[in-house]
């Protein structure tokens, strides 16, 4: 219950960064869902949203918040999403909810990326959480072998197909000291669609909600 309260506080703290007339990029996951609830309170002030997943899109529609296809949007001022982990550099691990590729696309399109998390997600070294990788199905074994070669322990996320029609590997036992290098290295493996390491497109602002209040890293 305390964790959910902290997620909600972080989500509502992001509202002050929204400007009238904005089209807002919206992420996926439990913290992003709290942000969608908060966005509903100012839906008449914004132009609409771009969503990273079907689940988020459904919630936005339920609140009668307009949705746009990213290809229709010439300027996306802001993207708000949670993370599985985030460090002081605002590099993140994302993808527990299987929407990492679309999240990375929208984050890259946005002028400003705000990450909203509770304090349990703030770490000094990334890698405690599994690192998700979206993979073309025929390349799953090849990619797994390449990940083992760099010291990771990949596990196939059975029964999950991404909205892009691909599969997921969750990589355990990685201590990520150079996230920029590792993101590039994994992305260069044939068959990898996207890795849930957000270092080259780090957050611009991190909103971290803890027992002592809100901490902002910008």
From Swiss-Prot:
Pfam families, alphabetized: Rib_5-P_isom_A
Catalytic-site annotation from UniProt: 103
Record's signal peptide: none
Gene Ontology MF annotations: ribose-5-phosphate isomerase activity
EC number, as in UniProt: 5.3.1.6
Alphabetical list of InterPro entries matching this protein: NagB/RpiA_transferase-like (IPR037171), Ribose5P_isomerase_typA_subgr (IPR020672), Ribose5P_isomerase_type_A (IPR004788)
Pathway the protein takes part in: Carbohydrate degradation; pentose phosphate pathway; D-ribose 5-phosphate from D-ribulose 5-phosphate (non-oxidative stage): step 1/1
GO CC terms in record: cytosol
Keyword Transport: no
Gene3D superfamilies for this protein: 3.30.70.260, 3.40.50.1360
A GO biological-process term: D-ribose metabolic process
Tagged with keyword Ribonucleoprotein: no
Residue positions binding substrate: 28-31, 81-84, 94-97, 121
Catalysed reactions, as listed in the record: aldehydo-D-ribose 5-phosphate = D-ribulose 5-phosphate
Keyword terms: Isomerase
Function: Catalyzes the reversible conversion of ribose-5-phosphate to ribulose 5-phosphate.
Subunit description: Homodimer.
UniProt-listed HAMAP family: Rib_5P_isom_A
Family: Belongs to the ribose 5-phosphate isomerase family.
Name assigned to this protein: Ribose-5-phosphate isomerase A
Native source species: Wigglesworthia glossinidia brevipalpis
Gene label: rpiA
């Amino acid at each position: 219950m305390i964790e959910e309260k902290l997620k909600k506080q972080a989500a509502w703290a992001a509202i002050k960064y929204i400007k009238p007339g904005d089209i807002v990029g919206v992420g996926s996951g439990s913290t992003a869902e709290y942000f969608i609830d908060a966005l509903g309170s100012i839906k008449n002030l914004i132009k609409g949203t771009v969503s990273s997943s079907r689940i988020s899109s459904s919630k936005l529609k339920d609140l009668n918040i307009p949705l746009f296809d990213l290809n229709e949007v010439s300027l996306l001022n802001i993207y708000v999403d949670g993370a599985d982990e985030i460090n002081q550099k605002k590099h993140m691990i994302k993808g527990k909810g299987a929407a990492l590729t679309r999240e990375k696309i929208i984050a890259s399109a946005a002028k400003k990326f705000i990450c909203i998390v509770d304090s349990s997600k703030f770490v000094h070294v990334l890698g405690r959480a599994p690192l998700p990788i979206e993979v073309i199905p025929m390349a799953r074994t090849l990619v797994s072998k390449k990940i083992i070669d760099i010291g990771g322990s990949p596990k196939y996320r059975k029964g999950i197909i991404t909205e892009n029609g691909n599969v997921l590997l969750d990589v355990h036992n990685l201590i990520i000291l150079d996230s920029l290098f590792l993101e590039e290295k994994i992305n260069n493996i044939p068959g990898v669609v996207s890795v849930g390491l957000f270092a080259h497109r780090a957050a611009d602002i991190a909103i971290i909600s803890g027992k002592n209040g809100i901490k902002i890293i910008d």
